[in-house]
């Protein structure tokens, strides 16, 4: 594997682990609000980010590329509201989208067609992630505090679906 691409993938897989901790911190904050459904929802978000990292690791290992696990920054632990948590999450996911697009650009540059195919799934996943958070923000703004109970029940219905390794 081209070294520039391997470096970018290593950076992203570590960012996925960092993202998991971001969502874990958000889940911990939400648990103080008594919103068990949203607590569940963000717990699943945490699991998904770890699954993404594992998928990157498998891809790197399958390509005989060196995986480098690094440290990460302490995530933010305090927020003003569920709405702020979701707004921060949307901004975070937009940053992930930018990173994935950068990796796709490198894969195209070095003509690594296996990486292009692999990362297409992530391109589509990011469209879904941004859409989910955007819709959640819209709903929270629409119902305000009085309707959070019903939204919380909807969030409780989310289940973790394991991501196929390939």
How should each PLM-predicted stretch be described?
Residues 1-166:
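Iron-associated oxidoreductase/ferritin-like identity signal
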């Amino acid at each position: 594997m081209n070294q520039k691409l391997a470096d970018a993938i290593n950076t992203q897989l570590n960012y996925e682990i960092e993202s998991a901790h971001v969502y874990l911190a958000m889940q911990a904050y939400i648990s103080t609000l008594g919103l068990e459904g949203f607590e569940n929802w963000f717990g699943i978000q945490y699991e998904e980010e770890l699954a993404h990292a594992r998928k990157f690791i498998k891809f790197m290992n399958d390509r005989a590329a060196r995986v480098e696990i690094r440290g990460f920054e302490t995530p933010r632990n305090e927020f003003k509201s569920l709405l702020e948590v979701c707004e921060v999450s949307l901004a975070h996911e937009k940053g992930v989208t930018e990173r994935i697009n950068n990796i796709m650009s490198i894969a195209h540059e070095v003509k690594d067609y296996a990486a292009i195919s692999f990362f297409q799934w992530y391109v589509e996943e990011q469209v879904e992630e941004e859409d989910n958070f955007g819709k959640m923000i819209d709903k929270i703004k629409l119902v305000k505090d009085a309707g959070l109970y019903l939204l919380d029940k909807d969030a409780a219905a989310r289940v973790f679906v394991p991501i196929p390794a390939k």
